[in-house]
Regions:
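N-terminal amphipathic/basic-hydrophobic helices that include classical n-h-c signal peptides
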Residues: 1-24
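Amphipathic alpha-helical hairpins
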Residues: 16-137
Length: 137
């Protein structure tokens, strides 16, 4: 549950940072506009990091190499996508399309493994890919 709690703090920070009334920065409260996609990206990144870490503890780590690599790539692009959406970047749609592509690859790889962490990651990647595709459309 610690992972979800950290997600809540990140989302609170995004909301606070984009809507603080006394901020001298340009007001770009894009968080509500992209809320479901940002949440999906952050949940996916969290699941990917957990999966990659757990895969390193598996007996046959060589068999998990592709999974670990895709988990790390997916987590990286998910964090980047969430950040760009929270900033209201004009590049957010393009990056979200790339994020969706990587999430689908990670979903496919993780689905091959029967471990709980891989199955959880596959589900999170599917949700994120679908949200990013909607956002990028």
């Amino acid at each position: 549950m610690l992972r979800i709690r950290s997600l809540d703090y990140i989302l609170y920070g995004l909301t606070f940072a984009t809507s603080h009334k006394n901020s001298k920065m340009k007001q770009t409260n894009n968080y509500p506009k992209y809320e479901s996609c940002i949440k999906a990206c952050l949940r996916c990144a969290d699941a990917c990091n957990h999966c990659a870490s757990s895969c390193t503890q598996e007996k046959d780590i060589k068999m998990m190499a592709r999974c670990i690599q895709l988990d790390m790539e997916c987590a990286t692009i998910c964090y980047a996508s969430a950040q760009l959406m929270s900033l209201g970047s004009e590049m957010a749609k393009a990056v979200c399309q790339i994020c969706a592509d990587i999430c689908w690859q990670c979903n496919e790889e993780c689905s091959k493994h029967q471990t709980d962490h891989c199955q959880e990651c596959a589900r999170a990647c599917k949700v994120c890919a679908e949200e990013c595709q909607k956002m990028a459309a």
